């Protein structure tokens, strides 16, 4: 969830909005009652408050997995460009580069206090810690949740050198002054309440910034609802619909505490709130996993792997109770946030080369400024296309307006989605995501073949646009080769 606030109560300079970005993990749109209207048997009233107070997006895109979605948000670049398409593992060398500016680094010259709390997943080494990328403070874990409890498995090697080389680090508390503290392992027991630890740190940081009359950028990342879900006794059985539903209710309560903090500080009326997550639902662990009506799941080329919840409110600026069908991506938030603080030229400036706090950056932002659409939804959104990538860094599909072309398909399901090779197609699969948003008609409709052949004129333009995207890598080459699970 993202919050931008122009409160005179929170900051002496009302042109500098506060920014609070709150994320769930592996939560698909249909797991939130603002989207599902209660059909899943539970409600998320606090998250729904954000949707009801502003804009709910129906065509919002994360990425195919955790690292890619988070990298796209914080850098404003396509994950292929940063080389951060593969899920980061303990001990991996890949991570966010100092050559790629973050939202936090770009906000520091505007006087912001910056804090990141909760899951990071943008690199294992100290050089990758958020406190080395523009954040004043970081407190959280570095990987996907199920990597954290591996040392407790009875088959885990007892050799301390193995754990040192390949094991997960603990929950890290680090600061921009170079201090790094390992607060201990994220054990199965600690997982029950780690989001409460993260929430407490976040609330304290907001209080600190408010007392200092400084604008803040806070990125809050929960472990809910990544597998494996471990709930404290008080959160178990509250819905009667299983562990995922119970976890969602707990997660919604944490969102409520953040919104209540804004009320307590009297800044809610001047705050933009955006809620989202990194990727689509992960079905393989159901019922300890998300659910989606879209085809596929996390780490596939299908909509179910990419569609994420996204909603934004800003009382007095954004009208309440709106629904937008514009295509929007996590990559769009960097230029949008910078526009909200008054910098509408950040994309062009970074492309030419821009010095920020003594460091020169020259990067190609793939995101677009959505602020004009937020303020007046009668204006079309600036994004007309979306490039889908595999975790190995290949273009697998493109959405161009209503139409999607799939060039590489993942035919496997469940865990096999992570193991099976991609099938390179001789001609793209084609879908109209308005007529067929769930990508079913190629195997359900008897007339799909005729419809496909009648729309083959769309193939060449889609290939041209992918080629145009790839051409930008000539001047802005891939930062690093993505990681791999095979040698």
Language model features: what each stretch is:
Residues 3-428, 437-487:
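Formylglycine-dependent sulfatase
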């Amino acid at each position: 969830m993202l919050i931008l606030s122009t409160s005179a109560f929170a900051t002496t300079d009302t042109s500098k909005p506060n920014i609070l970005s709150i994320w769930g993990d592996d939560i698909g749109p249909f797991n939130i009652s603002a989207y599902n209207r209660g059909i899943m048997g539970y409600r998320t009233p606090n998250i729904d408050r954000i949707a009801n107070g502003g804009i709910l997006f129906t065509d919002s895109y994360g990425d195919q997995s955790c690292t890619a979605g988070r990298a796209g948000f914080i850098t404003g670049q396509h994950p292929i460009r940063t080389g951060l398409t593969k899920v980061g593992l303990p001990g991996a060398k890949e991570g966010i580069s100092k050559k790629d500016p973050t939202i936090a680094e770009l906000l520091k010259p505007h006087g912001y206090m910056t804090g990141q709390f909760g899951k990071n997943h943008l690199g294992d080494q100290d050089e990758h810690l958020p406190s080395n990328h523009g954040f004043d403070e970081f407190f959280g874990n570095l990987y996907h949740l199920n990597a954290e409890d591996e040392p407790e498995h009875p088959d885990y090697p007892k050799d301390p050198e193995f754990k040192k080389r390949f094991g997960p680090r603990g929950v890290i508390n680090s600061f921009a002054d170079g201090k790094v503290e390992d607060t201990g392992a994220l054990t199965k027991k600690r997982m029950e309440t780690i989001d409460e630890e993260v929430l407490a740190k976040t609330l304290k940081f907001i209080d600190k910034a408010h007392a200092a009359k400084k604008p803040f950028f806070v990125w809050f990342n929960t472990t809910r609802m990544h597998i494996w879900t471990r709930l404290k006794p008080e959160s178990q059985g509250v819905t009667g619909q299983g562990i995922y539903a119970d976890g969602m209710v707990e997660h919604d309560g944490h969102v409520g505490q953040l919104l209540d903090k804004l009320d307590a500080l009297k800044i809610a009326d001047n705050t933009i709130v955006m809620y989202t997550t990194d990727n689509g639902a992960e079905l393989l662990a159901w019922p300890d996993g998300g659910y989606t009506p879209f085809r596929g799941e996390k780490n596939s080329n299908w909509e179910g792997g990419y569609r994420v919840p996204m909603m934004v409110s800003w009382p007095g600026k954004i009208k309440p109770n709106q629904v937008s069908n514009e295509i929007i991506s996590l990559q769009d938030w960097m230029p949008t946030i910078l526009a909200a603080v008054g910098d509408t030229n950040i994309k062009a400036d970074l492309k030419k080369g821009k010095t920020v706090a003594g460091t020169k950056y020259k990067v190609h932002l793939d995101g677009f400024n959505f602020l004009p659409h937020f303020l007046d939804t009668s204006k079309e959104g600036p994004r007309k296309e979306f490039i889908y990538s595999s975790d190995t860094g290949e273009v697998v599909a493109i959405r161009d307006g209503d139409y999607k072309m799939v060039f590489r398909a993942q035919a496997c399901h469940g865990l096999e989605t992570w193991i099976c090779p991609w099938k390179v197609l001789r001609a793209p699969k084609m879908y109209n995501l308005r007529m067929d948003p769930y990508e079913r008609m190629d195997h359900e409709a008897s007339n799909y073949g005729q419809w496909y052949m009648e729309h083959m004129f769309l193939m060449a333009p889609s290939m041209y646009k992918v080629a145009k995207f790839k051409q930008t890598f000539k001047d802005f080459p891939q930062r690093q080769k993505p990681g791999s699970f095979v040698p």
